[in-house]
């Protein structure tokens, strides 16, 4: 039998002795998974404290730092897709002045964390993110970059609407699809909402 579970949970299953014999390891070796997978992804799928044989196969990997935008809303307001936080802020201010909700967001803890990761990575980069939020280095947490990250979060909060607190992510996605809001920062799974609504990338 097989099951689909989140990567880190595999280790808990293994520690309880409920993972089947590591037969998949022979496939991993013959197919060269160590050379194909990012080391972090590979480790998640190895049992015996992430360093033993493969005991699971990656079937999907999500990314959470996507920006989804309504092209018509942007085009009608003379806005190009932003490529920096300054450009995004300027676009949001323009939408706000036109009476359009710039940032569709659901004020739930996991959604706030999703946006925070995108901002932290976008402003500070990989090394900053690892030093601050993985290794918890105090000098990083107290850095000017951290101040910039929280300042950008404050700005984004100002671009949401009064209905944001508690809103489900797919409702926020629907606001972008329907042209009620300009953009959303959400994982790649939001694509399903756009696809179900018949929207075409680069067109809608």
Predicted regions and their residues:
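Ligand-binding "clamshell"
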Residues: 13-21, 53, 100, 119-123, ...
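Short, solvent-exposed loop/beta-turn-alpha elements that line the ligand-binding surface or hinge
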Residues: 23-39, 80, 123-148, 196-201
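Alpha-to-beta junction loops
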Residues: 1-3, 99-102, 178-186
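Extracytoplasmic/periplasmic solute-binding protein
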Residues: 46-59, 65, 89-138, 181
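Extracytoplasmic/periplasmic substrate-recognition and gating elements
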Residues: 64, 72, 76-77, 151, ...
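Glycine-centered hinge/linker elements that transmit conformational signals in sensory
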Residues: 92-95, 134-166, 204
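Short helix-initiation/N-cap motifs at beta->coil->alpha
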Residues: 85-89, 164-177
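Hinge/lid segment of periplasmic solute-binding proteins
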Residues: 6-64, 89, 115-117
């Amino acid at each position: 039998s097989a099951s689909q579970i989140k990567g880190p949970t595999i280790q808990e299953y293994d520690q309880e002795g409920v993972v089947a014999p590591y037969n998949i390891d022979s496939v991993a070796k013959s197919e060269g998974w160590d050379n194909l997978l990012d080391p972090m992804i590979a480790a998640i799928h190895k049992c015996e404290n992430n360093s033993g044989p493969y005991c699971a196969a990656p079937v999907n990997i999500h990314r959470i730092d996507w920006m989804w935008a309504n092209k018509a809303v942007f085009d009608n307001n003379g806005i190009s897709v932003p490529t920096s936080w300054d450009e995004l802020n300027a676009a949001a201010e323009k939408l706000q002045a036109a009476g359009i909700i710039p940032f569709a967001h659901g004020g739930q803890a996991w959604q706030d964390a999703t946006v925070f990761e995108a901002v932290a990575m976008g402003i500070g980069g990989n090394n900053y993110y690892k030093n601050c939020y993985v290794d918890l280095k105090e000098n990083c947490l107290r850095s000017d970059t951290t101040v910039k990250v929280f300042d950008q979060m404050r700005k984004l909060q100002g671009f949401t609407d009064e209905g944001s607190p508690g809103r489900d992510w797919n409702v926020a996605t629907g606001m972008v699809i329907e042209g009620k809001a300009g953009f959303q920062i959400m994982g790649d799974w939001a694509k399903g909402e756009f696809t179900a609504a018949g929207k075409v990338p680069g067109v809608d």
